[in-house]
Amino acid sequence: MNINFSDALMLGGISLSFLLASQAIYFYFIYSPRAKKLGCAPPPIFFSFPLGIPDLIRLVNAWFHDDLLEWFTHRFEEFGRRTAFQSVAGQLWIGTIEPENIKTMLATSFKDYSLGFRYNAMYGLLGNGIFTLSGDGWKNSRALLRPQFSREQVSHLESMRTHINMMINNHFKGGQVVDAQVLYHNLTIDTATEFLFGESTNTLDPALAQQGLPGPKGLVTGEQFAEAFTSALELLSVRVMAGAAWFLVWTPKFWRSCKVCHNFIDYFVYKALATPMEKGQDADRYVFIRELTKETSDPRVIRDQALNILLAGRDTTAALLSFTTYYLGAYPEVYDELREAVIADFGSADAEPPTFEQLKQCKVLQNVIREVLRLHPNVPLNFREAIADTTFPTGGGPNGDQPIFVPKGQKVFYATYVMQRNAGIWGPDSTSFRPDRWNEPREALASGWDYIPFNGGPRICLGQQFALTEASYTLVRICQEFSRIEVLHPDVITARNVMKQRMRLPNSSSGGVITRFIR
């Protein structure tokens, strides 16, 4: 059958009209009556004709130009409300930066939501782990992993000290220009692999990084593993952003990278299963994967959970350190205050390492970290899907004070990045880097669900204390060694305190953190 251009155009017009009519029929004749019965009212609806396709194009363009978080910021400014319907590619999403609605989704009505498409999008690399599973699978994962993140396990600083000192001595002390962001990723994968496997990738030491581990297809070096993990996460981020179309995003390189990661970790898994720890052996040295073999002998379960924890243990801490280093270089008066507090509390470079408790008690240090996490939360944008009919407590109706009906199957996104910079919550200087805001009375600040840099509710990050401990101790060592941090591209911060950021897993500075550490 031959179809000419005019016929194709007519068919396209009919299809478009059908989709537009379907969306209108659903909203006005199905959604709205059901919402009214429950005493709910819809939030504002924002369409970009036709079918939200123009907004989809703008969103994709912003993502590729490392401007996605600012695109969402401007979008909520256009909404004029903290919760709204947004039409994207024919689908109605609910978007929210309202703390009470986020609290409801993540805590109060936690059982009414799942991760939706995220499981399938991330399965290729991460498998059945705590960050991909929902429901009973997630509960089992959390029960398995929670004991591994007790204070005793995350507060040992000696192994961190070795890698931090290697980074400082080999890469920072010469006064050369470095990309601190790259080195922080090396640092955190070295410390995370030592915590997880008992052996480090040693990417900060080129000689050790080239030592290979035997695998089914030959040697895999720590350096190769780190590169493969980074490469796999790049495409994983694209798959997550593609939403329901995740299956269209794949490349042979992605699957090769996943295979390298799996082979590398399988070496440690089978080694731990084959050589169970005898009583008293290395009793003072905690190794995550070895402890996990006491709970399960399934190698796939151990590998998947280890990969999930590695994702959190490497990238979130590296992002926190990268953004913090940038701000300390761009705001020398803040660095001077921090350095003075560190020397007063912990002494100079040759002093004994601080304890976990001492790090938490250094108020200036913790204020700096809190402020960076406010401006750059670890997961700035997140998604959920309703698995039962449920409601949000506020945001509906003409005044935004009525409940909102959230039907089963409804997709929701919440923008932590936008919420934690919102002037209505944090005041007129909400986009400014001002660590001393945390000295103000708590009631004068946002409280509770206004600030969730590690997410919240039952799915709050298990490795939160590990990340904060490593970041805190790294900053202490930098302050002990260097009088000044010189950032070589301070102009990337605009009047809105916006840095070009790559929205990946997690977000990072798109231009790196080009830095010189001055002794």
Swiss-Prot record:
It is found in: Membrane. Its cofactor is heme. It is a multi-pass membrane protein. Its EC number is 1.14.14.-. One of its GO terms (molecular function) is heme binding. Its main location: membrane. CDD domains: CYP52. It comes from the Eukaryota. Heme binds at residue 461. GO terms for cellular component: membrane. The keyword Oxidoreductase applies. Keywords: Heme, Iron, Membrane, Metal-binding, Monooxygenase, Oxidoreductase, Transmembrane, Transmembrane helix. InterPro entries: Cyt_P450, Cyt_P450_CS, Cyt_P450_E_CYP52_ascomycetes, Cyt_P450_E_CYP52_fungi, Cyt_P450_E_grp-II, Cyt_P450_sf. The chain crosses the membrane at residues 10-30, 44-64. Belongs to the cytochrome P450 family. Together with an NADPH cytochrome P450 the enzyme system catalyzes the terminal hydroxylation as the first step in the assimilation of alkanes and fatty acids. This is Cytochrome P450 52E2.
